[in-house]
Amino acid sequence: MFDILMYLFENYVHSEVEFLVDEDELTQELTRAGFHQSEIIKALSWLENLAELQEGDKPYLCNHAQHSFRIYTQDEMDKLDVECRGFILFLEQIEVLNVVTREMVIDRIMELDESALILEDLKWVVLMVLFNAPGNESAYEQMEDLIFEQPDGRLHS
């Protein structure tokens, strides 16, 4: 399923191609690209649920103290190792994520089929969430820089 999400993000969203495609057409294209029907359905459902998070009717997306500390459940810790949880905290500290977008990221991660997530995959989920969260354009650009900038090995310029 994650491969399909990456395919869609790279071919439609990130390439700035107009994303006004009929779901049936999209399913056919993904099938032609070699993806299995069951995985396509899961990926499209994942994206639909991401869009629904914008409505903010989930209790964990409302009424948070701005400087609250996130305690992860055991299931979340099983899926997100220490490195991934640390990266989420880092993103909050540099204000790429706020309380709401952090919870959206965790929600979407928990819906992925993967039993554990690697840091690179987490970065892409964050980018997908920020892209779909209105008002987070600056955070999206900052996250894009974190993903695509390659360190040149110098500590000082």
From Swiss-Prot:
Organism: Shewanella woodyi (strain ATCC 51908 / MS32)
Lineage, highest ranks first: Bacteria, Pseudomonadati, Pseudomonadota, Gammaproteobacteria, Alteromonadales
Gene (UniProt): smg
Pfam families to which the protein is assigned, alphabetical: DUF494 (PF04361)
Protein family: Belongs to the Smg family.
Sections of the chain in a coiled coil: none
Protein name according to UniProt: Protein Smg homolog
